[in-house]
UniProtKB/Swiss-Prot annotation:
Residues 1-39 are annotated as: Disordered. It comes from Sorangium cellulosum (strain So ce56) (Polyangium cellulosum (strain So ce56)). PROSITE patterns: RIBOSOMAL_S18 (PS00057). The lineage of its organism: Bacteria, Pseudomonadati, Myxococcota, Polyangia, Polyangiales. Belongs to the bacterial ribosomal protein bS18 family. HAMAP family: Ribosomal_bS18. One of its GO terms (cellular component) is cytosolic small ribosomal subunit. The keyword Signal does not apply. This is Small ribosomal subunit protein bS18.
Amino acid sequence: MNGRNNDMGRNGGADYDDRDFGRTPDLNADAPGRRRTGRKRVCRYCADKALVIDYKDPQALKYFISERGKVVPRRISGNCARHQRKVTLSIKRARNIALLPFTVTA
């Protein structure tokens, strides 16, 4: 015997060294089931300072509303946190004065 317990325990009888269990995963390897998202989007309002977020412009705000009438999240729209808050506030104001619908009818 080599000093180890000889029963068929957790490792099914395989003879592993202790260092095999404490190994850190390879951080450069792609995780299975995850997709690469490509390039990070740049906030259009930070890139072009001439663009303004206005609640009275429903055509510009429709880009940030989904088909069901929900506000599109930052990770999809590409806005920075500051401009996403302003877009959300503008959408809510436009809904209150009936420039944008609260829900989309089928």
